[in-house]
Swiss-Prot record, chains A, B:
Stored InterPro entries: Aminotransferase_I/II_large, HisP_aminotrans, HistidinolP_aminotransfase, PyrdxlP-dep_Trfase, PyrdxlP-dep_Trfase_major, PyrdxlP-dep_Trfase_small
Gene3D superfamilies: Aspartate Aminotransferase, domain 1, Type I PLP-dependent aspartate aminotransferase-like (Major domain)
Cofactor: pyridoxal 5'-phosphate
Quaternary structure, from the entry: Homodimer.
Domain of life: Bacteria
Positions of post-translational N6-(pyridoxal phosphate)lysine modification: 225
Reaction(s) this enzyme catalyzes, per UniProt: L-histidinol phosphate + 2-oxoglutarate = 3-(imidazol-4-yl)-2-oxopropyl phosphate + L-glutamate
Broad EC category: transferase
Protein name: Histidinol-phosphate aminotransferase
Family: Belongs to the class-II pyridoxal-phosphate-dependent aminotransferase family. Histidinol-phosphate aminotransferase subfamily.
Pathway assigned in UniProt: Amino-acid biosynthesis; L-histidine biosynthesis; L-histidine from 5-phospho-alpha-D-ribose 1-diphosphate: step 7/9
GO MF assignments: histidinol-phosphate transaminase activity; pyridoxal phosphate binding
Amino acid sequence: MKFNKVLENIQTYEAGKPIELVVREFGIAPKDVVKLASNENPIGTNPAITKVIRSNADIAHLYPDDSMFELKEALSRKFDVEDENIIIGAGSDQVLEFISRALLNEASSVLMSAVTFAMYEIYAKQMGAKIIRTESYEHKYDEFIEAYHTYKPKIIYICTPNNPTGDATSREEVLKIIEGVDKDTLVVVDGAYMEYAAAKDQKHAIAPTDLLKYENVIYLGTFSKAHGLGGMRVGYGIAQAKLIKELYKMRPPFNITTLSLLVAIEACKDDSFVEASIALHQEQIKRYETFAKENGISYIESYTNFITYLFDENLDSTQISDALLKRGVIIRNLASYGMNGVRITIGTEVQNDVFFRHFAEVIS
Amino acid sequence: MKFNKVLENIQTYEAGKPIELVVREFGIAPKDVVKLASNENPIGTNPAITKVIRSNADIAHLYPDDSMFELKEALSRKFDVEDENIIIGAGSDQVLEFISRALLNEASSVLMSAVTFAMYEIYAKQMGAKIIRTESYEHKYDEFIEAYHTYKPKIIYICTPNNPTGDATSREEVLKIIEGVDKDTLVVVDGAYMEYAAAKDQKHAIAPTDLLKYENVIYLGTFSKAHGLGGMRVGYGIAQAKLIKELYKMRPPFNITTLSLLVAIEACKDDSFVEASIALHQEQIKRYETFAKENGISYIESYTNFITYLFDENLDSTQISDALLKRGVIIRNLASYGMNGVRITIGTEVQNDVFFRHFAEVIS
């Protein structure tokens, strides 16, 4: 059978290693595995969410309301936008997929920073688009605008805060990039970790309403990180109605589960869980900064729920990640991103204790 | 912004109307709404599944094992195939999407019966492919082979049992169609309702192992119907490893939720719920056949969990569906499929009582 030519050029996304794999491969008991690899919320699941799941555990046979009326109402109140400005995805990932499929083809190019979320490239390659990267992992106006004028990309991705590096781009810089490109280029502002950046520094806070006046900009958000719902797969895109309507043409019906819809609605009701998550995070990340300084390890200042350690030639990120894995500590090796570094999700106090104990031994 | 040209030609799928909509629009209490529109399992959720959901309601923050190791093991045992023969989708729908994206482009055509599952057309149109339909809604060898030779379609869809008509194609006929086309055409055998057909008549039972010797055939199955897990969005494709590997390139990571993965694994453990679902169905569908005969209404003999009534010029499917909707009874109008008919999910005894009471009044 002859497959579409684009398939020749696609590598599949390497997900963070699951606890189950460590259990299977190294015979470590699940309770002894510390997973700091996938930027899951270390507090766990919001008890209010657990309650919603439990009380709806008997409607797994029912399809969700495909209009997602209630969730859109909740999000429109939360972000001060209209229902027609919102599209829901199975994670903001899926909205990235809709965008890619609606806009890209084999004649297109897309522009992103040197090191950023891996799915931008994968979804773009699925459409045969050419990948252009700036020199830096940070989103720098000069680099983006220069590349924009050279390549006229169809899509520019601004991941802020950036994953897997943790740095953020200021609202001012993002708006400058947006103002610097014409209306036929879509600018995707991916705020998957925005709650952490906004809590740390208002200069880096970007809200959908900051962007809604631009017809060629879409804001992406997710329930996976600060809301602690990674396993439920719900994210959203917010943009002008005309753009949302086009993206809807690529949305499959029932693209989130019945329970996912209900928990996302619940998550919109109360910010206290997000606030508690951020408070724990802000307290615990200091330990990672201190540890790095004390051990002569570089790190990128983080605006996210993880921290990125960068190693010099004395340490090898692959060796370190593998050694930790055998000890039941899962972190994210950044070798596949071309970096000699690791991304570590900030865990609970106990998880971080375990990490530091093993990490100190592994690097010594 | 310039969108891909294919978007000009896409209509979005019209999902069955949710209970929430009837509640919102007609002010009917949720408990008084009878939804027989989406072929959901009327027995409800398997209590064993409810238990799994309840006991995992506190891990919504954790991403699923993206290798889906355990689920693939369970499915490979169930169907006597290897892990490498399996791809999991968010419903078998998503596997249809992978297939479409891996194989189709603006130079392709796809072949399907006159009336069949709406998503075949939608996913094909998203890739710009041309839609060819046979004359009949039944999958007839002569019609398929004639159209095959005329159009050389890239994909042939065989939906058996067929949705929204309910008829099934015998294993012999399906194999004849497969043998009649060359290896560059993929034949999709969509068995979303296969459990019902197999229970009714072994001649219509098709198992993945019946098809695995063909490199250009894929079998699709789902947990949404007989397993009663429509709201969890889990389906699968089974084919030769080479084909599965290509489809994997279009699979996004974490494409089903953590709870969906767990419940699908649980569903593979025990067939008694499926058997009970089918037993209820076989008993209740007789009432629909009897009612039709007594009221001079034609119907298509059903191999699925629904029945399709076909009206003559004295009855209008849109008027009838709308009238029932206002009474809180949701069925599926087939006008958008070009049929003056309705598709009714076979409900519980009580649901069917309600349906017959209102339906008798509406058509009188």
